[in-house]
UniProtKB/Swiss-Prot annotation:
Source organism: Staphylococcus haemolyticus (strain JCSC1435)
Chain ranges of the KH-like domain: 352-436
Gene Ontology molecular functions: GTP binding; ribosome binding
Residues where GTP 2 binds: 182-189, 229-233, 294-297
Span of domain EngA-type G: 4-167, 176-351
Family statement drawn from the similarity comment of this UniProt entry: Belongs to the TRAFAC class TrmE-Era-EngA-EngB-Septin-like GTPase superfamily. EngA (Der) GTPase family.
GO biological process: ribosome biogenesis
Function: GTPase that plays an essential role in the late steps of ribosome biogenesis.
Complex formation: Associates with the 50S ribosomal subunit.
Entry protein name: GTPase Der
Classification via SUPFAM superfamilies: P-loop containing nucleoside triphosphate hydrolases (SSF52540)
Length: 436
């Protein structure tokens, strides 16, 4: 399933970022950042009235010295391309402008749901000034105040009404769903073509030539797969040249639909910050991961080269210490078959469930080897551990006081559980909970 994307659009200086920060800071439950993951905060994942969604702030687009009209068009184009619901924001103090009307025309042609928000309605008397905005053709305008936080609940109530009911993909549960992600020009499309043995995706040495993603079913050695080629990691002409951070939005959709995520990095260029950002999305979604080092044919090698590169990957991607690393050349078609055992193992472990009795024996043994911590004379007591979910495997540890479960000890228990049950390729989550 994929979360709906809500985009806040409008001309500059109408308060988009203020409203985004209001929604993120006060009205939405934000997914906690993962240590070691670098991420631009132009989107957040949250929920409103039990509806989960991704919300993006187009106020941060950097176009450099491009004309004013190009900025407006860039914001609207991104929203049209990626959003499921659009919050179109205008400013009551400046009234209806020609730029507002231009944005409205673009959004109207998109045929996507648009909720009109009139910002800076800071007192009840100003509500009388919103009626001019009816002429934009998007129904009732919603008066809000970013500075005072007024009207946001009514606005979000209307937004979630436009969410489609989420449906599961129709693929068989034994089919492994793969998304292939990475920064532009690391060879994602070439990897897809090499796996499938045909040019299913346009490939060019210019970053961003991949078409819109199309699922492709594939079988190998008796296992069925669905490849989701994430065209979302592309750029689209001049409009996207300085907005690379927005290219993750479509990749997020593909990640959410996946069992296993292949994170592709360029062996020739090495690891850069954008690789970490891309990898962070998969990790935070709790997906099984395989790291694919592509273009391995371009690297001068000796007997230690692969180990040195793997060590560097481990150092740079410490939050993905569970992921296997495959070295391939999509262009030459070499070492591709080494991918599939890693993919299969990661998928199997992602779905794995373990018996509570055996699990508690492992935890008891772990505590005997490394006793629980104390704080101000109080010791953490672990009463019982149980698995409450899979995909990813999630465990609740019942304790006397959650505050006594230090991060380091939780990580220790995680490592012991991982080692005992063989959870290679998948994250596992441990949730301490106070026993009543």
């Amino acid at each position: 399933m994929t979360k709906p994307i809500v985009a806040i659009v409008g001309r500059p200086n109408v308060g988009k970022s203020t409203i985004f920060n209001r929604v993120v800071g006060e009205r939405v439950s934000i997914v906690e950042d993962t240590p070691g993951v670098t991420r631009d905060r132009i989107y957040s994942s949250g929920e409103w009235l039990t509806h989960e969604f991704n919300i993006i702030d187009t106020g941060g687009i950097e176009i450099g010295d491009a004309p004013f009209q190009t900025q407006i068009r860039a914001q609207a184009e991104i929203a049209i391309d990626e959003a499921d619901v659009i919050i179109f924001m205008v400013n009551v103090r400046e009234g209806l402008t020609q730029s507002d009307e231009m944005v409205a025309q673009m959004l109207y042609k998109s045929k996507k749901p648009v909720v009109l928000a009139v910002n800076k309605v800071d007192n009840p008397e100003m509500r009388n000034d919103i009626f001019d905005f009816y002429s934009l053709g998007f129904g009732d305008p919603y008066p809000i105040s970013g500075s005072h936080g007024l009207g946001l609940g009514d606005l979000l109530d209307e937004v979630v009404k436009h969410f489609d009911e989420e449906t599961e993909d129709s693929y068989d549960e034994d089919t492994i769903r793969l998304s292939i992600i990475g920064r532009p020009n690391v060879g994602k499309s070439s990897l897809v073509n090499a796996i499938l043995g045909e040019d299913r995706v346009i490939v060019s040495n210019v970053a961003g030539t991949t078409r819109d993603a199309v699922d492709t079913e594939y079988s190998y050695d008796g296992q069925d797969y669905v490849l989701i080629d994430t065209a979302g990691m592309r750029k689209k002409g001049k409009v996207y040249e300085s907005t690379e951070k927005y290219s993750v939005l479509r990749a997020l959709k593909a990640i959410e639909r996946s069992n296993v995520v292949l994170i592709v990095i360029d062996a020739e260029e090495g690891i850069i910050e954008q690789d970490k950002r891309v990898a962070g999305y998969a990790h935070e979604e709790g997906k099984a991961v395989v790291i694919v080092v592509n273009k391995w044919d371009t690297v001068d090698k000796d007997s230690n080269t692969m180990k040195k590169f793997a060590d560097d990957v481990r150092n740079q991607f410490q939050f993905l210490d569970y992921a296997q690393i495959a070295f391939v050349s999509a262009k030459e078609g070499t070492r591709l078959r080494t991918l599939f055992p890693y993919i299969n193992e990661a998928s199997e472990n992602h779905k794995k469930r373990v018996q509570s009795s055996t699990l508690n024996e492992v935890v008891t043994d772990a505590i005997s080897m490394n006793p629980t911590p104390t704080d101000k004379g109080r010791r953490l007591n672990v009463f019982y551990t149980t698995q409450v979910a899979n995909e990813p495997p999630t465990f609740v540890v019942f304790v006397n006081d959650v505050e006594l479960m230090h991060f380091s000890y939780k990580r220790y228990l995680e490592n012991q559980i991982r080692h005992a049950f063989g959870f290679e390729g998948t994250p596992i989550h441990i949730i301490p909970r106070r026993r009543n």
